[in-house]
Amino acid sequence: MTQRQKESRRIAGLVQVALDTLRNQELAHYTDPVNAPQPYLSSIQLRDLVLQDEHSVSARRRLWARVESVVEGNANVRANLEEMEGGDETRVWRWVGSTGTPGMKELEFES
């Protein structure tokens, strides 16, 4: 497997983690709004969570640019600017698709 193929596979995995995290945040907000007061996550927070094991700044930048492109192109994700605590505006992503359990689609198609 070439380096490019390995990176593409890694990007796909990182995108899936990001989408699952956004879906879980949306669900957590409606299930327990005290512990999850916002239905969205800052793209920067999500980047730091998803790439916590990548310590090279240039690699993080390159990987995140590709992840960001895929996530923002997903019809289930809405990107907005939100004012955070302290008054700073930051880019946030919110899951707007179904929050059903991820494995349910597989079960429906098997029957």
What are these regions (language model features)?
Residues Q3-S111:
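Intrinsically disordered, low-complexity juxtamembrane tails/stalks of eukaryotic membrane proteins
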